[in-house]
Amino acid sequence: MGFGATLAVGLTIFVLSVVTIIICFTCSCCCLYKTCRRPRPVVTTTTSTTVVHAPYPQPPSVPPSYPGPSYQGYHTMPPQPGMPAAPYPMQYPPPYPAQPMGPPAYHETLAGGAAAPYPASQPPYNPAYMDAPKAAL
């Protein structure tokens, strides 16, 4: 037998053994399944524990800082002792400045009395102006 055949046989045996063990651990009739599922005895020691019930310290009552209405199913949670309170701003930030509306509108009367760069009246229609130029012969 060559090296490739020996390797194939060894790999096949390994895979079959792993599959057999997995099936045995999951099958209820196998002895490995029964030994793993059997409850282990609990070793107890004779240690006694004394529990002292002390009243839990209540935080001082703080009036709610939210000015809105309270809801029936909602209860505010008091802050935990030893934890810092959330920093609330003392005042609201200033509002944003209004956006500029663009350049002011143009008025001819405010232009300083300068003459218009074009005539105010429209010249009459001239069809000869639109004709193609004629080639000279």
From Swiss-Prot:
Localization: Endoplasmic reticulum membrane; Nucleus membrane
Gene Ontology CC: endoplasmic reticulum membrane; nuclear membrane
Keyword Transmembrane helix set for record: yes
Coiled coil stretches, renumbered: none
Parts of the chain that traverse the membrane: 3-23
Record key words, sorted: Apoptosis, Endoplasmic reticulum, Membrane, Nucleus, Transmembrane, Transmembrane helix
InterPro entries: Shisa (IPR026910)
Protein's UniProt name: Protein shisa-5
Organism: Pongo abelii (Sumatran orangutan)
